[in-house]
Amino acid sequence: MENKSVDLSIIILNFNGQQCLEKLLPSLKNHFLSKTSFQVEVVVVDNASTDESVDFLKTFDWIRLIESEHNGGFAYGNNLALKNNRARYVMLLNSDTEFTDEDSNLDRLIEYMDTHETVGIITPKVELTDGQPDRACHRGEPTLWAAFTYFMGLEKTFPKYPLFATYHQSYKNLKEIHPIDACTGAAMLIRSSAIEKVGLLDERFFMYAEDVDWCKRFRESGYQIIYDPEVKIIHHKYKSGMGNSSKTAKSNATYWFYETMQQYYDKHYQNQYPGIFRYLLKLFISFKREK
């Protein structure tokens, strides 16, 4: 990968997210691009937006714009850019994220990857708008047992016990850098040479679960996934990829979360648990999805 001409390619997927981009792009420019010591490019994939996003994006001469003919989902859109990647590392970044002045130094993540060749993915600490952690950036493998303990409230009751808190691995020290099982596609930095080995995102997942699926495939290929709390990105959650009000967007997000959760378990755990356990989980997911 030494012949790559760019150190980092930041891939931003957009669907009707002009208002989000109006906040993200200046923060990215001011708080990272103007300070970094690395060669960085910014690629925005527009997933067939129906708002004025494309016209807005064309006003930025430092952005490489890819226009999709249709909205094929998160994996499909990001893969359009990944297929033409020319950087040593890529970062998937939601359009509803924001960089901060002191904490969003991606150089630290690149430097860590440069000195740790077994790391395939590294994620910053992702905070929600209210300052609370976005727990999706720090996850364990969502086995059926992990899902059961999470949805039954056992993780919340016993957050420091590994047996009951594997879904978000809340028993680990969140103030220190350490390995995790999975992170969120809202902000993840990936080694390009590892993608060549692992493969692209699974486009059968329209939205959600494709990041967890990718992380699982990275781990199965021998790569580590690292969480670094010293780097922070703000996530204004449920604002990207929906094109609706926050309430409607959250409702849509909930539906797709449970829809793709079922896909994930069908893909990876179809024959690994007793039939009755899989049946009960499927009933629960169906109930939550339609609620």
Where in this protein do the model-derived segments appear?
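Short aromatic/hydrophobic "clamp" motif used to bind/position activated sugar donors
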Residues: 90, 96
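N-proximal low-complexity "stem/linker" segments adjacent to membrane-targeting elements
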Residues: 1-30, 38
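Active-site-adjacent helix/loop segment of glycosyltransferases
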Residues: 216-291
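A short, conserved alpha-helix in the catalytic core of glycosyltransferases
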Residues: 173-200, 204-232
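Short, flexible, basic/aromatic active-site loop/helix in glycosyltransferases
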Residues: 141-180
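Conserved donor NDP-sugar-binding/catalytic core segment of glycosyltransferases
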Residues: 101-136
